[in-house]
């Protein structure tokens, strides 16, 4: 029940039209392969967006990943993330043991000056599931990422035919939810 789940997260979804709109959106996304049962943070972000409560901490302008032996990487990966925060463009390179680790390093580096909480975020689990068996390397995949800041742990989902793009989607949501949660905790301590 969407109304019950929304209530558990602190959102009043008693308006039948609003609840129906969110339910339809979730059904559309589930038909594409998304699953929110194990991705509460992505569910909450979807509800916030539907209610017009989504916070825009940063805008992604561009990202790119290299992996393998090219450019002297010796099997490691390198990522460039270019984002806009409060009108300022920030571009950072991250290196890591795989494409997602490199993207995580680059995004953390780009965010931490404006949002110090981002430096506390740690990716603790990463799961990939093939959704349409038999399609081989062009299969649709679902990615779940668990992230923690040492206080809370949250999970986000990404879906697509490109495992790196699906991973980026889940990572992006993890940072958005984490920054929102960190801001809420700071506000409640100040209040």
Where are each of the predicted segments found?
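Terminal or standalone catalytic/regulatory effector modules within metabolic enzymes
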Residues: 1-191
